[in-house]
């Protein structure tokens, strides 16, 4: 199992602060996050592209969507910040 923590708009849009999941890569988490968001809010409009634009950290270092995961890893997905 890996621990997934969400920050920024992604946390607000999904209603998910943290969850645990089985996944082979960061990208494998996408459908799980979308499914969990819809379970918490059936009207959720979160989609793959919302997650795809996130900053990825795995165990405190920058990761990629293709980063392989192993049991005990911690993944952080954070929406990029913008504004002026």
PLM regions and their residue ranges:
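Ubiquitin-like/PB1-type beta-grasp interaction modules and other compact soluble beta-rich domains
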Residues: 1-83
